[in-house]
Amino acid sequence: MAERILLINPNSSQSCTDGIAAAVAPYAAPGLPRLDVVKIEEGPPAIVTWRDWYGIAEPLCRMVEREAADAYILACVSDPGLEAVRTVTDRPVFGPLRCAVAAAMMRGERFGIIAFTDKSKPRQRRALQAMGVETRLAGTIPLNLDMEVLTDPLAPRARLAEAAKELVAMGAESVILGCAGMAGHRNFTEDACGVPVIEPCQAAVAQAILAVVSARGDRMRIAAE
């Protein structure tokens, strides 16, 4: 049976889900795990508040319990439900924010985050504190745009370019797109600011592929013994 990586968008936005799928599509290739992208139908339109963040943990757990996969990605850049979901599966579970931070630190000493809203900042700061890397953050700039504006092919781009350039001026050597709704704007933002721009769902897929393919190698070695 083909290996499967399941990306779960915890919000109910179809445009956000479609953007995630398009962003990770280049990572699908013969011989690699299949990438499936789904959304939580009963989820909020976006993960904005702490209530959204905490409330979505149980629906995420239920989906992981009923959907078999070789790895899971919780496709929101505040990593909601990460600890809870890890208790209901023995498969690897990835948070895009943590994966993006790891990727950013491989590209430079300091990074910046373009956040979804002001309310995103405390949740992302908590994750950075848990990772012990808060001092590597050059700054965070929120866009404060609605999800459906953020996922529009053109509407948020002037603001994204402005925010990315401001983060570079603050000392960022790479920039993280701090919402999965920004997934379709990575190339544009990188061209605008001149430093590496990390799309977190792509970073998480790269780590998930590594985990799944490594496990494949372990199984083949055990079978040969």
Give the predicted meaning of each segment.
Residues 119-178:
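Active-site rim beta-loop-alpha module in soluble metabolic enzymes
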Residues 6-8, 111-114:
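Conserved beta-strand elements of the Class I
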Residues 7-8, 70-76, 172-179:
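Periplasmic-binding protein-like
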Residues 3-28:
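N-terminal beta1-alpha1 ligand-phosphate binding loop
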Residues 37-61, 148-153:
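N-terminal beta-loop-helix "entrance" segment that forms/cooperates
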Residues 54-69, 157-171:
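Short, well-structured alpha-helical segments in soluble
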Residues 86-107, 189-208:
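Short, acidic/small-residue loops that bind anionic groups at enzyme active sites
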